[in-house]
Structure formats: C-alpha cells, structure tokens
From Swiss-Prot:
Function: Acts as a chaperone.
PROSITE patterns referenced in this protein's UniProt entry, alphabetically: HSP70_1, HSP70_2, HSP70_3
Protein name: Chaperone protein DnaK
Modified residue annotations for Phosphothreonine: 201
Organism: Chlamydia muridarum (strain MoPn / Nigg)
Amino acid sequence: MSEKRKSNKIIGIDLGTTNSCVSVMEGGQPKVIASSEGTRTTPSIVAFKGSETLVGIPAKRQAVTNPEKTLASTKRFIGRKFSEVESEIKTVPYKVAPNSKGDAVFEVENKLYTPEEIGAQILMKMKETAEAYLGETVTEAVITVPAYFNDSQRASTKDAGRIAGLDVKRIIPEPTAAALAYGIDKEGDKKIAVFDLGGGTFDISILEIGDGVFEVLSTNGDTHLGGDDFDEVIINWMLGEFKKQEGIDLSKDNMALQRLKDAAEKAKIELSGVSSTEINQPFITIDANGPKHLALTLTRAQFEHLASSLIERTKQPCAQALKDAKLSASDIDDVLLVGGMSRMPAVQAVVKEIFGKEPNKGVNPDEVVAIGAAIQGGVLGGEVKDVLLLDVIPLSLGIETLGGVMTPLVERNTTIPTQKKQIFSTAADNQPAVTIVVLQGERPMAKDNKEIGRFDLTDIPPAPRGHPQIEVTFDIDANGILHVSAKDAASGREQKIRIEASSGLKEEEIQQMIRDAELNKEEDKKRREASDIKNEADGMIFRAEKAIKDYQDKIPADLVKEIEEQIEKVRQAVKEDASTTAIKAASDELSARMQKIGEAMQAQSASAANAQGGPNINSEDLKKHSFSTRPPAGDNSSSTDNIEDADVEIVDKPE
C-alpha cells in the first residue's frame, strides 16, 4: 500500500480538558472534522486496558469499570509540579505521583506517564481524524491553550504536539482563537470580550478587532476553575445525600465515584435546559442488607446554589481584564461565550450582570476555538490573507534581585513577540558569579511568584559591588515561550536559557518519545487487528448458532453437524489464543459452511415453489444468516515510557 502524500494544511486543534476538537481550512472556510465515531468533539480521555491504549469515546465507555487506569482531565496537570496540584488530585480516581524532579505524573500499573505523553495520545487521535478526512499525512498544527497558562504549561503543550508527530507552528490562547472565528468575516472596529469557561480553566480576554487586525488588549483568568469543579459540587452533594439516606460513605469507592462523576456531568448538562433532573444509579453499592440504589432529584435552583461560589469567582478576573485594558463594561460591543459551562443559565446571567448586555450566543462554544485555530493555521500557511493577530503574555516575567524582590522585565499584557533588556549588577565586592532566577507572576516578592527557571553567569572579573554591567535580555516568541540571556559587558561572557516545560524533557528525549510512539503505533495496530479478528470470530459463532437454531428443520442434519464441528474449532482457536491467521482461517471456513445453509434453503425453497407455486423463505433472513462482513482494523497508539530530566537546558556561550 502506498504512503499517503504529505498535506500542506496546518490543522487547528483545541486540546481541551474535557473534550478536544480538530478543524481545517477548506476552500477558504474552516471545517470541523468528525471523528471515526461520528462525533465533532472527542473526549480528552486515555485509558489502559490490558495491552491496549484507548483514546476518546472507547476510553470513556469503559471508565466506570476501569477508573484507576482511565486518565481524564489530565490537562489540569500539564506543566505543573506535584506540589501545585493537591486540590486536583483529590478529584481524580487515578494515581498522581511526583517524579524525581517533583513534577506531577500519572502512575498506571507501576509505570509513570507524563501529562505530555497523555496529551500526545489525544493529539494523535486528532491528527488521525484529520488525516482520515483529508486522505493525506498531516504534520503541522496550531494548538490552543488557556490564555492564563504559564510559560511551562505552554512549553509542555508544544512538547505534547511534537511527541504526537506534529510540528506545532503556533500555540495560541483559546479566547484569541474564538475571537478569530467570530471576527474573521466582521466589518468595522469592535471591542469584544471572550468569556471562556471550559472543563478545567476559566479565561477572559478583551480584544479590539478591525480591518483584519485582532489585538488582545488584556487577559485574565483562573486555571483552577472549570466544568470539573461544577461536577465536583454535584458529586459531593450526592455523596452527602446518600450518606444521610443509607448511612454509607461512597467517597472511597472509586467505581461508585466514577458512576457519580458520569451522573453529575449528565445532570449538569440537562439542567441547562430543564428546571430539574432525576439522578438514578441502581446497585451503586451493597451492604449486609443487600444492594443499595441511589435515586435523587436535583433542581436547577439547587445546583445554582451549590455552584454559586464557583460562578462568583468569574467576576474578579473580568473586572481586572477591563481595568488592564483601560475600558469600562459599556465600551464592550459584544461578549462571546466559549466553553461548555458557558451554557449554564446562571453563568450567562452573571455575564450579563458584569458587562451590562446579553452575551452573543451565535457561536458554538464547543467548536469555536478549534475553528479559530484552523484560521490561524490558514494565516500561517498563506491560505488566509490580511489577518494579523497581536497577542499578549498573561503574566509578568522578571528576575529575583537583591532582597528577594521580583523585578519585572516584561509586564503582563505586553504584546508578543517582544524583547526587553535591562542592566543589573553585583551585590557584593569581587562577586565571581550571579544566579539569574526567572520568575512569572504579579507579586512584589520573589518567593510569592512561580520560579520557571534559573541559571548561573560565572567568571565575572573582580570588581567593586555595583560596577559590573550585566545585561539581562528577555525574548518572548509568538508562542509566548521565553528565552533569557545574561551577558557580562567586561568579559563578554554570556549564558542563555530557554524556559522548558516543567517535565524537563530534553530535545533528544522528545525525539526518542516520538520514535517510540511510532513503533508502538505499529504494535498497537497489530493488537487491534488481532482483537478485531477475535471479535469477528465471536460474532461468527453467534450468527452460526442462531442460524442453526432458526433453520435446523430446514437444512440437512449432516450440514448441521458439520457447522457445529466448525463452530467448536473457531471457539477453541479463540480460547487458546491461537494466531490471528489460524483464527481467521477457522472463521473463514465457518463462513463458507454457513453459505451452504443458504444454498440448502434456496434448494428447498425452489423445490417448494415447484410443488406449491411460490417461495416460502424470507430472502432477508437468507442474507442475515448466510454472509458476514469483517470491519476494517482500527489504529491506536500506545503510550511511550516516562522520561525525566532537568527543568531547563543551559547553553554556555563564552566569548
């Protein structure tokens, strides 16, 4: 079979906490691509079941029976230290552990997986979805991230794309992508707010659009606020109600919790359209008196009360974003709603309260981000003309200076790409070296901000305190990823650092993970093909036994015996885990035997027609029991080994 030709398309991927979506420019218009399951969004879930790695809908379907090996909402852990995710760990059934560098990783069957690896599995699924639609190999993508993602989270997302075999041309914030999708065909100047409440994060961005220029004026948000948190308040309510009714605490039962998670998500969605919903979970647990059932009614008013503190948390970031943009709510022409949680009536009411106007509901909150990413892909690929995107950094960047002070070099909401330089000096006489501690955040003291990297500038010539001239340069690229350098004017000595993902994956390790992913892809494909052949064999046995039962009195006894013997051969081949070739051969032989049923029945039908003047066998039944089709083998990529390394890559460049 010939290789697919390489596509010149740059696809757009919304890598979401709960769901992901892929889009591509086609004929000058963005198109959302449906998955192999026929859905326009794919659950951002990866599961490990035996030797198989499941992604998307298949992973979600088995989550209740396999909670500890089903990884959902992993985006909340990407680019973060274990010490930063205590609250998130409490909400997931799988094991989150620190690796040797203190990064948050997932432990499944004594194997560690980084959030980048799991993200890569989802991105591979999106890549394959696009390739199946285009009929070409896709190698380039624009991937979206929450606007309030910090530098290491952005770098981690880019690494996930590379592991998935994608050249990530640009990382852009989700609200910015949504604004692109909204404003690409709009005329005139407008100031818009994008209110993005997704599965795991909340972002608010203020933009000015006009004449093809999309300028982000400010951005703010909360990376710990999203649909998962709304699910959690319903789960806690259900746990409390069930404990009151039955005296049983379900909070330590992972299988029950996964069922409650699914029920909470379903109830949350339903309550956006109805005033109350029934939650029924039969046989949720069992005690000495027998099985117990959970049956509750949750009203919209109750849910809004339970979630009131979460909804309230969206107000302050909106106020800050308006303040940073030097605008009032009345200056905003339109408010876009993005993310599944923006469908909640109480959320929409708060948006109206904040901005003093009804929000725009003309975009699909589940798809608009992927559409915007595809448009940006079109801009980068030259397919979309006369569009300029001016983005900003969400948090200030600086270094630690004397007294443990955070000295910003680049203020938040600075348009990127950008470069800033500042001269620093030593704090002691004859100081031979300085440590450059790179920080991100808004607090005045260094310890209260996030350290995203550090490096040493050594061999500074002896000089009195304050005399050496050390030029520190911050260079931020269009992806919002930071490069820092420090140069001593006297010696010409310079050191540089690229702020890496906190997982600390080195370049060669990323390349190894890419190679591993490709190797595992072929192995997993073989496993999937073997699984499909076994499933088809089981189906063939079922159809053959049903055909014998239905038509035993219409076919010769020796044929019945022949088929029963072949059924047993197929069953034994499957049971003994024979080779796929042997199972397929036995199944094909059974299929041939089953065709004899049709031939025998047709002969009997013809004989009856001659004797009685007409047929007496239903032709649809003949088709149903005489033929089988083998579905095409699927494809699924297994995960790569966990790799750990230092937080940053240091390059010495002495002059």
